[in-house]
UniProtKB/Swiss-Prot annotation:
Subcellular location: Nucleus; Chromosome
Domain of life, source organism: Eukaryota
Modified residues (N-acetylalanine): 2
Region of interest: Disordered: 380-413
Listed GO biological process terms: DNA damage response; tRNA (guanine-N7)-methylation; tRNA modification
Name of the molecule in the record: tRNA (guanine-N(7)-)-methyltransferase non-catalytic subunit WDR4
Gene name for this UniProt entry: Wdr4
Subunit note: Non-catalytic component of the METTL1-WDR4 complex, composed of METTL1 and WDR4. Interacts with FEN1; the interaction is direct.
């Protein structure tokens, strides 16, 4: 899966990442001059046994691109994983790198526990490892494993359950204290599960998105599906039909009015829903359209929806609800210095310009067996006919004439 530019936010601290670098600053504008910058290419690299190829020589060490990042619940800690198979942990007040630790495989997602004592990382081989926050140099511990690639991991707000989403359409709910003990499976998706989110204000509910182009609501402890929203049915006339390209790269929740937004990588659209908790249903509200590709979105509780887009002049925009409709905030709502920092650091975002859909390779390959069978049958019949013609002489050929001569002479006698 390719790395793309992304956002992470906690309280008023916003992180913008791209390539191997990230910038961290305040969204208020009062601390715009206090910008923390980090480049993973400068981080310590340690060789592991998995880094050696079959011939014993060092294998590809990676590009240092950031694959995933997240804040802890309080915002006190920030963690990221990169393409060089490292987990890097930071303290945010003040910003300081606490540790650089190696992971076994390249990671696809990570999250902090609610107690902020551990970081859970999910990797491409289907395993989840936990790393201590309180012991920054401690090694990772294997917690659980799937038989296929993991695409997301989440923890319930009470730290009782670990939820994992994989390429084989499954969402597993495991007990955190004994991850081998499975509480339930949430089954129903027909393609890979790209993202999951436990609803913060309703911790018994789970949102999930998939390559099948649906957004689903679950009561995850029982594995019961409450609702399935087909995103293809929300497209405008003339847009490309079908579910491919509607796998969400981000599900975000805004606690103020229970808004849920869904960002899909292949369309410059953000779908807006509202959660009706009393009915346990999602209500579709609006489609936000953009003239540029949207890389990521994230909610700030006090202000609205931040949107990171492929536009050098306005890389970061803010959207707010006005009279029940989401609208782009005036230019003055986004600090000029904040946008200036991003324009000056545009080189770190350029690597995400024009990148392909990172989920494209995850779709199941489909085969039309009947068409293939009929085609092969036709080819076989044509070959048989060709061989038959080669064995049989054509009418009027010398061989045909010779065979006819004895009969003719007998009649003449």
């Amino acid at each position: 899966m390719a790395s793309s530019a992304g956002l992470a936010l906690c309280a008023q601290t916003l992180v913008v990442r791209g390539g191997s670098r990230f910038l961290a600053f305040s969204t208020t504008g009062s601390d715009d001059d206090c910008v923390f910058t980090y480049d993973c290419s400068t981080a310590e690299k340690k060789a592991t046994p998995e880094d050696k190829g079959e011939d014993g020589q060092p294998a590809d060490t990676g590009s240092d691109s950031i694959l995933a990042s997240t804040f802890s619940k309080s915002g006190r800690y920030f963690a990221l994983t990169d393409d060089s198979k490292r987990l890097i942990l930071f303290r945010t007040k003040p910003w300081q790198c606490l540790s650089v630790r190696m992971v076994v495989r390249r990671c696809t997602a990570l999250t902090f526990t609610a107690s902020e004592d551990r970081v859970l990382v999910a990797d491409k081989s289907g395993d989840v490892y936990s790393f201590s926050v309180l012991e920054p140099d401690g090694c990772g511990r294997l917690e659980l494993g799937h038989l296929s690639m993991l695409l997301d991991v989440a923890v319930s707000p009470d730290d009782q359950f670990v939820l994992t989403a994989d390429r084989d359409e499954k969402i597993r709910v495991s007990w955190a204290a004994a991850p081998h003990s499975i509480e339930s499976f949430c089954l129903g998706h027909t393609e890979f599960v790209s993202r999951i989110l436990v609803v913060p204000s309703h911790p018994e509910l789970l949102l999930s998105s998939s390559g099948d182009g649906t957004l689903r609501l679950w009561e995850y402890r029982s594995g019961r599906q409450l609702q399935c929203c087909d995103l293809a049915g929300l497209q405008e006339p003339g847009e490309q039909p079908g579910h491919k390209g509607l796998a969400a790269s981000r599900i975000a929740f805004w606690g103020q009015e229970s808004y849920v937004v869904l960002l899909c990588e292949c369309v410059p659209v953000v779908f807006v829903f509202q959660l009706d908790a009393s009915r346990q249903q999602l209500v579709f509200r609006q489609r936000l359209t953009f003239p540029h590709r949207v890389w990521d979105v994230v909610f700030e509780e006090a202000r609205g929806l931040w949107v990171l887009q492929d536009c050098r002049d306005a890389p970061l925009v803010l959207w707010r609800p006005v009279g029940g409709e989401w609208q782009a905030a005036p230019d003055g709502a986004v600090s000029p210095r904040l946008c200036s920092h991003l324009r000056e650091s545009w080189a770190m975002l350029e690597g995400s310009v024009g990148t392909d859909d990172s989920f494209r390779s995850l779709y199941k390959a489909t085969f039309d067996n009947m068409t293939s069978y009929l085609k092969k049958k036709e080819e076989r019949l044509q070959q048989q006919l060709k061989k038959k013609r080669q064995r049989s002489p054509f009418p009027g050929s010398p061989e045909q004439t010779k065979k006819a001569c004895p009969g003719q002479s007998a009649l003449s006698c």
